[in-house]
Regions:
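Phosphate/nucleotide-binding beta-alpha loop and adjacent structural elements of enzyme active sites
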Residues: 1-221
């Protein structure tokens, strides 16, 4: 069968666009953060933790890794409505936690929060929907689920309460190969994570920073 030049163009272009759209569909994170992350991690069958998982699709940093690279992990979302959507949208092999991560000195089993679309704030000043969420430190959550394997990626988006979450991590027991954190307190966070043997790697967006675990050679783990 003979094709002229225009037949070839007519055939190739629609398929190219179709494949491009299909490929881009998996990248759902803001500012292509998931695409940027993959350049550094680039592996299959990994294990992630996403705190602030939303509905599991919209603005998700881990959707791509699950759908294209067969990752599984822990998805954490304190807002009940979003948590229900999260469980419906993501693979059932994930671990789903409807809790708010807190520091190790927080004693109450619950915390009051305010929810505004994609933003959840602890004791926020806005007048949006109030919710009451269960609390846990991250290390308590990992111990409860008997997570002893090395964690490939921890992505943290908690709207200004990064220090509280970090305070709830037993770094002597749990570590993360890559740590993505959204924060407006970069230098403070960088100093703290550096003390835990995390090296700053790259700024991936206006407020998203990637760190890598770099244990000292003499450190015993």
């Amino acid at each position: 069968m003979n094709f002229n030049f225009y037949d070839i163009i007519k055939y190739l272009v629609p398929n190219f666009l179709k494949n491009l759209i299909k490929k881009k569909r998996y990248y759902n994170a803001i500012d292509n953060i998931d695409r940027k992350l993959n350049k550094y991690i680039n592996r299959r069958n990994g294990f992630y933790i996403e705190c602030g998982a939303n509905d599991g699709v919209n603005q998700s940093n881990t959707w791509f890794f699950e759908k294209k690279l067969n990752w599984r992990g822990i998805l954490i979302e304190p807002v009940p409505k979003l948590f229900t959507q999260l469980k419906n949208n993501r693979c059932k092999k994930n671990i789903f936690e409807n809790v708010c991560l807190v520091g190790k000195n927080y004693k109450s089993k619950y915390i009051n929060m305010r929810y505004d679309n994609c933003q959840t704030k602890v004791f926020g000043d806005n007048k949006n929907k109030k919710i009451k969420a269960k609390t846990s430190t991250l290390s308590e959550l990992l111990d409860k689920n008997k997570i002893i394997k090395s964690i490939d990626l921890f992505t943290l988006d908690v709207e200004g309460y990064e220090n509280n979450v970090l305070d709830g991590i037993n770094f002597a027991k749990h570590n993360f190969k890559f740590f993505l954190i959204e924060t407006k307190k970069f230098f403070k966070i960088k100093k703290y994570l550096s003390s835990k043997n995390y090296q700053f790697i790259k700024k991936l967006s206006r407020h998203d920073y990637l760190f890598k675990y770099t244990p000292k050679k003499y450190e015993k783990r």
